[in-house]
Amino acid sequence: MNYRELMQKKNVRPYVLMARFGLEKENQRSTREGLLATTEHPTVFGNRSYHPYIQTDFSETQLELITPVANSGTEMLRFLDAIHDVARRSIPEDEMLWPLSMPPQLPTKDEEIKIAKLDQYDAVLYRRYLAKEYGKRKQMVSGIHFNFEYDQALIQQLYDEQSEVTDCKQFKTKVYMKVARNFLRYRWLITYLFGASPVSEDRYFRVYDDQPQEPVRSIRNSTYGYRNHDNVKVSYASLERYLEDIHRMVENGLLSEEKEFYAPVRLRGGKQMSDLPKTGIRYIELRNLDLNPFSRLGIVEDTVDFLHYFMLYLLWTDEKEEADEWVKTGDIFNEQVALGHPHETIKLIAEGDRIFSEMIDMLDALGIRKGKEVVGKYYQQLRNPQDTVSGKMWTIIQENSNSELGNIFGNQYQSMAFERPYQLAGFREMELSTQIFLFDAIQKGLEIEILDEQEQFLKLQHGEHIEYVKNANMTSKDNYVVPLIMENKTVTKKILSAAGFHVPGGEEFSSFIEAQEAHLRYANKAFVVKPKSTNYGLGITIFKEGASLEDFTEALRIAFKEDTAVLIEEFLPGTEYRFFVLDNDVKAIMLRVPANVTGDGKHTVEELVAAKNSDPLRGTNHRAPLELIQLNDLEKLMLKEQGLTIYSVPEKEQIVYLRENSNVSTGGDSIDMTDVIDDSYKQIAIEAVAALGAKICGIDLIIPDKDVKGTRDSLTYGIIEANFNPAMHMHVYPYAGQGRRLTMDVLKLLYPEVVQ
């Protein structure tokens, strides 16, 4: 069958780049000094029996990070980035992920290498068998398994354009068998470009072991890596022959079970190999990628893109020998390349030239212009072995050592994970509370699907239990009407007042002129102007000592800009506190100090704001724990009330407030007060939220004196607002005080069977 012609058909070409990707990556945990960790798998990751993203491989110290299936290499790497952040921040503080395929220095005694402590006893027994049959040390090598599937739409179009095979499932299997054979034949190129295990640490090989002449390109991908015994031979001529050979090996005792068969490429269908006759081959797993220590993920996007184009090439190019001989030639070439010196030119230059030239021709024929740059980059390395991963490693190792290389990069990547611990790599454009929520969900092993990134809409799943979450705390636990109640400040006040809670008096206006005419009633009072239905403190102006008509009018203009109706309310004196109530319990209390700067007698207000905004904890759009302080109309109005402008130079230690309202979302500072506020106020908050019918709520109380016990029917407090989607990041990472992991509390509410 001429796949090259099929791939160029008009109906096929729009689909040639469509594929599905997945990745499994192993790393040993080591100390920050580069010694194999001795701790058990962190319990913070939950149960390994179901965790979809973070598992252990052979040993208790060998993490396996698993991405969900993605429709692009970029999306796959994005999730891998997030899983790395979770893994690195969750392991003990004195540990890191060892960035090399070859393990750090191993203990002298094999019994000190601990097999993974799994719940499934048969899995433990299987690892014990592998340890006895192949030795523990070979099992400690780490790498990447790259899962690749041609999109079903591409397979269907190819199938429709041919007439030799009359069943699409059989056609798909035929495609993957061809690609598998070609991969085994040409995998030497992958070993050359991406091999990254040139040397081993002391005690990896025993004195009586057969050892390579180090350095090489890839110990892991040579006969010195992990592989079956020489008497295990399997044909790739057809799926039937492949399965028959493996079955015979098991029957003859050469393999303990089907999954013991280990090859650079694995054919995948159902959950077990025995499912393949029924399911056919659904995708293939490439198992010969070493960890790239020059990437904090162990792999770079260019490598993923190259592998994608390489997989297209393997379908494009013809086989030139009988199947078993074709594969055997590939084994010989791969061994030659794997055991070559990292800085030596390979003997397969001519074949490499042909492969790269044909790949470029294929990209031209299929109209894949963007692929030529990536392919060209790696083509350049064909004659420059020092630029390959193993070549660059050997350059460093010669001047330092392999362990030093591992230590330098391992520590660097571990530190990078903590530069902005409140963000989640791969998802930094999402709201901060959602990022923290995603971190916790990944850590605990909940399956995640991002339904709408712009809307912060997530789907979580554990077994058959599915939950939908918006903005990190809008869940099925609150019914539809609850957010509508809290969105409407007039309705909120009426419900709370009817339930016996103290709320400020005031008026509602939908007409700018009518509101303006109310000025005389408030000119000499303390009052607040705010939109009727907004969150995050937008459009609010506070006048503690009355206001001129000009300022009153400006406040109305600002409020009407946010909503079609505004409220003018009495100002309640006291300190404002945000109570975060979840499931009839106060989980956190926050004192929010309005946006402010402290003078130094030298710099203007504008310059002081710029300096304070340089704090890495400050950002925009809820992607940092604190928001940038603005200098817009509201802030300038606030300065005017203090007799200042943005060009004024405040005296030393003079505190200048730029906002009257204390929302962190408008540049305020957050201070945790959970353990300071009397329980009487917590009870008031709980009862008020219950009156609104909410499970999750941020409710704002004004308290004149927190040392005086609060009572529901008194003036010891006043409720000024309730929020249906309260920000959580300011509680998790406060400006001062203890952080409260509210995102984990939400997860516990949704999945008590997972989060204990």
Curated annotation (Swiss-Prot):
It comes from the Bacteria. Residues 493-751 form the ATP-grasp domain. Pfam families: ATP-grasp_3, ATP-grasp_6, Glu_cys_ligase. InterPro entries: ATP-grasp, ATP-grasp_PylC-type, Gln_synth/guanido_kin_cat_dom, Glu_cys_ligase, Glut_biosynth, Glut_cys_ligase, GshAB_ATP-grasp. Signal peptide: none annotated. Synthesizes glutathione from L-glutamate and L-cysteine via gamma-L-glutamyl-L-cysteine. This is Glutathione biosynthesis bifunctional protein GshAB. It comes from Enterococcus faecalis (strain ATCC 700802 / V583). The lineage of its organism: Bacteria, Bacillati, Bacillota, Bacilli, Lactobacillales.
